[in-house]
Every structure is written in structure tokens, then in C-alpha cells.
């Protein structure tokens, strides 16, 4: 792990203004859909706990114009998804966002939608794309040119190691690629570049045999083969998991390609809970600890696709310590939307990062 720390962290800042068109949404959500359509940051769906122990899913579609200079965002609710949804995936392509799968209180989803804006009315236009071969939620999604990938997650209600792909605009059915090696991965992150797919994070809940991986996987689309990628490490040298984190491919104006990652759970604390061990805290008290106890990842991490090495360009920052956030990219600037600060507590914050 290289640590090329910049002297000051003005590159990371919190913006004010969060959507509030539905009762409870203003408390912040996690696992929403978000991305840019032109100059508009679009946020849709997500979930939270407006009342303790009662998860609520949302259907609103919100838009805020972003110039890059503002410190606050002004939101307008411009429409609704066909039903409340969260824990799906989203990619940006041209003047549209593609929303993939997800779930709500009633069921998990097979649906794949594209959304773009009516330039005159400012309202969202939804189009239905080929549905998934099974319901999928809590997966990773990414785009390689025009091929959409869905990695792991819960498929038909079961943790999966499946890899699915669809050529947008050309194919009517999804392709089943070679499975991820070893265990299923729920809540992984992924990105794709020049014929290769990169995956980190995810978890497999299986009692004392539960797994929360730190190392990643690379899938070569030509040879259909898998290789192992190094784990990210924090400034103290400890391996990190990117379970519940975000990942985004960023290509600089000079052509340098990096996968930028932030957030995610603490491996040891999360494993202790999903395995049912509860050696760190009594099960009844797991949701009652202070935010700092959960030790969500507060490092901004970049994986250089040329060197194959991880880097930490900024000091640790508590603004990034969240799980289940969504990330949107405009130019080389990233906007992190919502997420949870600890299990059950969402953030209404939007964090702007300029690498």
C-alpha cells in the first residue's frame, strides 16, 4: 500500500441540502440509486428507519443541478419509480441512468430500467430493459463500454457467486458468465476497464464459516479466467474489506485509470455479528453502540490499474466512514450520497471529493 498523503483535506467536503419530498426521506437513506444525467445529480429510492426497527423504502426520484462550485444543493422531486426500491445497482450511460434490480418490503426485483430526463418538462422518462433472469439485490454492478455486469448479491433470495452480463441496446437476454471462485459475495463493489472486471468486498453469511473477504478478483473477459487482486490496507497497514463500500472507475484527463473506493464496514466487527459469534458485544446491544465503535472505513482508496497498487491520497476522514452509500461521478469529482453511519442510522449528507 502506497501512502502519498496530501497536506490538507480540502479535497473532501460536506455539502448541505438533501432530498425531502417524501416523509422521512430527509433523515437520510442508504442503498439508493444515484448518478448524473448531464448537470443534474439524480437520486432515487433508498431506505431508512424513520421509526426504530421499521425499515421504510422510498420511490421518489429527485434532481439537483450541479455546477461544481456550490456548497449546497437544491432538490426537486421530479417523479417516482414504479415501486419503492433500494439495494439495487446503477450505472451511467450517455444521457441515461440504468437502474438494476433491488428490493423492497414486499419482494426482490428482476426489473431493469433506464431513466433519462424530458428536456422540456424536466420529468424522468422510464424505459423497461430486458429483465434479469432472477431477482437480484445487494449486488455489484458496472459497465464496460455497453456491456452491463451484475456481480453476486442475493439471487432469488440466496447468496450468489454468479456473474451476469447484458449488451445494452442489442441483447434481449442476459448471459451467464463464469461464476466467481470460492464463496458467494453479497454487497461487493466492482468496476470494469479494457476487457477486465475488478471486484472487491462482499460477504457470505454462513454461521461460523461466514466470510468477509479483503482480497479482490479480476475477471478476464477474453480468457474467461479469474485471478486474485491485493487487498486494500489502511494507513496502519491492516487489510480492509470493501463490503458495503463504493467503487468508481475514474480516468484522468492524462489517461490514468484508477478505481476509486470509499466506505465499507469493519471486517472484524461485521464478521463477529453475521457469524453469530458476538464476542465483541452482546447481540442485544449490537445496535446501541456509538458511531465510532463500528469503525467503518474512513480511508479514500485508489487502485492504479497500470501498477496494480493501492494508494491513499488523502488523510483519513470521518465524512467517508459510511456503508451503503451511493457514488456519482461528474468529470473527476465524486459525490457520495447518503449511506449509514452505523447499523440503523442513515446519513442525510452528500460528500464531495475531488481527487
Which residue stretches match the model-derived regions?
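Kelch-like beta-propeller repeat domains
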Residues: 1-355
Amino acid at each position: 500500500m502506497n501512502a502519498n498523503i496530501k497536506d490538507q483535506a480540502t479535497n473532501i467536503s460536506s455539502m448541505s441540502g438533501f432530498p425531502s419530498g417524501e416523509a422521512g426521506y430527509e433523515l437520510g437513506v442508504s442503498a439508493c440509486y444515484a448518478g448524473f444525467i448531464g448537470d443534474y445529480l439524480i437520486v432515487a429510492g433508498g431506505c431508512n428507519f424513520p421509526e426504530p426497527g421499521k425499515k421504510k423504502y422510498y420511490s421518489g426520484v429527485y434532481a439537483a443541478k450541479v455546477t461544481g462550485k456550490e456548497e449546497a444543493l437544491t432538490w426537486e422531486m421530479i417523479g417516482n419509480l414504479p415501486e419503492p426500491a433500494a439495494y439495487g445497482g446503477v450505472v451511467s450511460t450517455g444521457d441515461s441512468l440504468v437502474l438494476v434490480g433491488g428490493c423492497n418490503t414486499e419482494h426482490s426485483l428482476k426489473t431493469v430500467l433506464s431513466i433519462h430526463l424530458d428536456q422540456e418538462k424536466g420529468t424522468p422518462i422510464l424505459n423497461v430493459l430486458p429483465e434479469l433472469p432472477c431477482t437480484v439485490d445487494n449486488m455489484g454492478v458496472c459497465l464496460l463500454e455497453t456491456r452491463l455486469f451484475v456481480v453476486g448479491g442475493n439471487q432469488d433470495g440466496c447468496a450468489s457467486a454468479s456473474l451476469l452480463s447484458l449488451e445494452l441496446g442489442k441483447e434481449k437476454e442476459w448471459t451467464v458468465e463464469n461464476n466467481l471462485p470460492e464463496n458467494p459475495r453479497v454487497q461487493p463493489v466492482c468496476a470494469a476497464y479494457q476487457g477486465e472486471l475488478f471486484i472487491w468486498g462482499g460477504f457470505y453469511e454462513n454461521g461460523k464459516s461466514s466470510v468477509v473477504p479483503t482480497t479482490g478478483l479480476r475477471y478476464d473477459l477474453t480468457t474467461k479466467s479469474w485471478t486474485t487482486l491485493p487487498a486494500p490496507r489502511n494507513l496502519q497497514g491492516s487489510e480492509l474489506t470493501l463490503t458495503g463500500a463504493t467503487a468508481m472507475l475514474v480516468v484522468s484527463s492524462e489517461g490514468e485509470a484508477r478505481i476509486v473506493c470509499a466506505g465499507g464496514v469493519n471486517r472484524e466487527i461485521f464478521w463477529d455479528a453475521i457469524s453469530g459469534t458476538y464476542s465483541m458485544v452482546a447481540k442485544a446491544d449490537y445496535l446501541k453502540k456509538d458511531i465510532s465503535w463500528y469503525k467503518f472505513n474512513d480511508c479514500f482508496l485508489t487502485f492504479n490499474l497500470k501498477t496494480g497498487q493501492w494508494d491513499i491520497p488523502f488523510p483519513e476522514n470521518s465524512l467517508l466512514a459510511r456503508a451503503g452509500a451511493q457514488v456519482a461521478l461528474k468529470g473527476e469529482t465524486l459525490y457520495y450520497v447518503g449511506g449509514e453511519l452505523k447499523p440503523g442510522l442513515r446519513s442525510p449528507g452528500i460528500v464531495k471529493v475531488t481527487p
